[in-house]
Design a protein with these regions (language model features):
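Sec-dependent N-terminal signal peptides
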Residues: 2-8
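Cell wall/extracellular polymer interaction/catalysis modules
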Residues: 8-164, 175-187, 191-192
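Short cysteine clusters
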Residues: 167
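Conserved "landmark" site that anchors the functional core of diverse proteins
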Residues: 171
Length: 192
């Protein structure tokens, strides 16, 4: 059975497409295709408050353009909503390290609850973002190895009512439908 599932993934790629009408737009359209057929969307998405850029840098307010893998773990504050990927329920002390000087830049980190992490910068206390990060998937932008300053913490997450700092956001109901459908090997293409 596993061999059949693997063959399906290889023969029938799952692709997420985020298309902004222009490089400066803060909204986009998200669709999901499998075997070249649209299976989800079109949905309204939000991108960075400065649009989409192939030259994204840490803190510049753009969403990076290009094609990226989706991380193997979905994170969230609530119980697993039924995703196919591995799920990690966020708890106090779960951070995304966004400090370009840190050795663990652009990675998930857990520190003791209440402890001050050794990394600083714009690092995110994931468990505190109760609207945006009820569920999130990591966009594998600038990972393995991460280049300091090139950008970090690019996620698919719930819409908060405005443009993002560089992530892609969707209305929460659409996000949960997408996260449940995601399978290993999915790719995300962002462009204008």
């Amino acid at each position: 059975m596993l061999t059949v599932a693997l063959a399906l993934v290889l023969a029938c790629p799952q692709r997420i497409h985020v298309t902004a009408p222009s490089a400066r737009a803060t909204t986009a359209t998200l669709t999901v295709t499998e075997c070249g057929r649209r299976v989800l969307g079109p949905w309204r998405a939000r991108v960075g408050y400065r649009g989409v850029s192939a030259h994204h840098r840490e803190g510049d307010g753009t969403t990076p353009a290009g094609t990226f893998a989706i991380g193997p773990v979905v994170y969230g504050l609530d119980a697993d909503p039924g995703v196919r990927l591995r799920y990690h329920r966020l708890r106090c002390g779960d951070w995304w390290d966004e400090d370009p000087r840190s050795r663990s830049y652009n990675r998930f980190r857990h520190v003791a609850c209440g402890a001050t992490p050794s990394f600083r910068g714009g690092s995110e206390a994931l468990w505190r973002a109760t609207v945006a990060y009820r569920e999130l998937a990591v966009v594998e932008y600038n990972t393995a190895p991460a280049v300091p300053g090139r950008g970090s913490g690019i996620f698919l997450h719930a819409d908060t009512g405005h443009a993002t700092n560089g992530c892609v956001s969707l209305p929460r109901n659409d996000l949960v439908v997408l996260l449940r459908r995601l399978r290993p090997g999915a790719s995300l293409t962002i462009g204008a």
